[in-house]
């Protein structure tokens, strides 16, 4: 499944690899990869495969789930499709409470004591997913864990998720993606090395000249 999803993401352009011409993230960090999983919304077969895969992850790891929660905004559509497949209630969680109306951070019902699984599109440092988890916990929900489409497998993300005491599972990951990209001839040996070095320490730009 990991390599299948990675292949889909590469084929539709949801993931770009440019180790020789790095992207600059909003944080200012240089990166050889850019991921925009919103593009999966435009490809019915891809999004259906993703929904089925996320459902499998949830059933395997969080079988007692009662509510599916999407992260705003990228996780909302996938959460909706998964909740529909599983015939479960769904809500979504904003990055912060609204500044008007009722000031809701959680939209839809997520009641005290309910067992919730968070659906996220991408795990990088884990920040947005953890914000979602914390809001649900503050509302009295029991957060079973997180499922996502893709993870960069960054140590910073793993450490934050562990510190937040939340389990996280992804359909595909950075390792599978680089392997598939190499198999497809998208990247060569030199590019593969740069990608591997970046993941070890993204903040150290020495990978650019690796």
Curated annotation (Swiss-Prot):
Q: Which transformation does this protein catalyse, written as a reaction?
A: orotidine 5'-phosphate + diphosphate = orotate + 5-phospho-alpha-D-ribose 1-diphosphate
Name its GO BP terms in alphabetical order.
Answer: 'de novo' UMP biosynthetic process; pyrimidine nucleobase biosynthetic process
Question: Is Glycosyltransferase set as a keyword in this record?
Answer: yes
Is NAD tagged as a keyword? no
Name the positions where 5-phospho-alpha-D-ribose 1-diphosphate binds: 94, 98, 100, 120-128
Q: Which cofactor does it need?
A: Mg(2+)
Family statement drawn from the similarity comment of this UniProt entry: Belongs to the purine/pyrimidine phosphoribosyltransferase family. PyrE subfamily.
Record's subunit section: Homodimer.
For this entry, the protein name equals: Orotate phosphoribosyltransferase
Organism lineage reads as:
Bacteria, Bacillati, Bacillota, Bacilli, Bacillales
